[in-house]
Curated annotation (Swiss-Prot):
Region called Disordered, residue ranges: 164-192
Note: Vif-defective viruses show catastrophic failure in reverse transcription due to APOBEC-induced mutations that initiate a DNA base repair pathway and compromise the structural integrity of the ssDNA. In the absence of Vif, the virion is morphologically abnormal.
Domain of life, source organism: Viruses
Species of the source: Human immunodeficiency virus type 1 group M subtype B (isolate JRCSF) (HIV-1)
Name the record gives this protein: Virion infectivity factor
Region (Multimerization): 151-164
Stretches the record annotates as SOCS box-like: 151-180
Length: 192
């Protein structure tokens, strides 16, 4: 029988970012209580020897699974140390990979207090609303003018330690798109 390969998108991540992510997740699961219901699995609880940790985040009937890996093939540079992370959205019989922005948005739909756009209408109607958003990483677009005005009045409160953001976990120098040099900076185009 031949080998069957499964291709996954794995974001290359610095080892220290993975340690920080795991620490933040465990802090908010066990100490602050903001990540209630999240499941943290250690490397020894996985059958895959490449998995270093797994965080399962319940999202209604589905769940978001953030898996960190070690011992992967290194990248082009010396600092690509073979560490990585993948994000997967799973429901009963279906799963798909998601990017860090979408992962943060999915987390924010179910967790952490937020001052959302619907709060503007509620504030106008005289209802009590949450004054700030705890999880800024869950917002990817610029809000309406009213939303921006209200957020300018009420500064976001810094939470120590910060809430775990998947986007922040994958944010690194080798995951950013490469900037190409202009005509002046390219040696091959100048003939030098």
């Amino acid at each position: 029988m031949e080998n069957r390969w499964q291709v996954m998108i794995v974001w290359q991540v610095d080892r220290m970012r993975i340690r920080t992510w795991n620490s933040l997740v465990k802090h908010h699961m066990y100490i602050s209580g903001k990540a209630k219901g999240w499941i943290y699995k250690h490397h020894y609880e996985s059958t895959n020897p490449r998995v270093s940790s797994e965080v399962q985040i319940p999202l209604g009937d589905a769940r978001l699974v953030i898996t960190t890996y070690w011992g992967l093939h290194t990248g082009e540079r010396d600092w690509h140390l073979g560490q990585g992370v993948s994000m997967e959205w799973r429901t009963r019989r279906y799963s798909t990979q998601v990017d860090p922005d979408l992962a943060d948005q999915l987390i924010h739909l179910y967790y952490f207090d937020c001052f959302s756009e619907s709060a503007i209408r509620n504030a106008i109607l005289g209802h009590i609303v949450s004054p700030r958003c705890e999880y800024q990483a869950g917002h990817s677009k610029v809000g309406s003018l009213q939303y921006l005005a209200l957020t300018a009045l009420i500064k976001p409160k810094k939470i120590k330690p910060p809430l775990p953001s998947v986007k922040k976990l994958t944010e690194d120098r080798w995951n950013k798109p490469q900037k190409t040099k202009g005509h002046r900076g390219s040696h091959t185009m100048n003939g030098h």
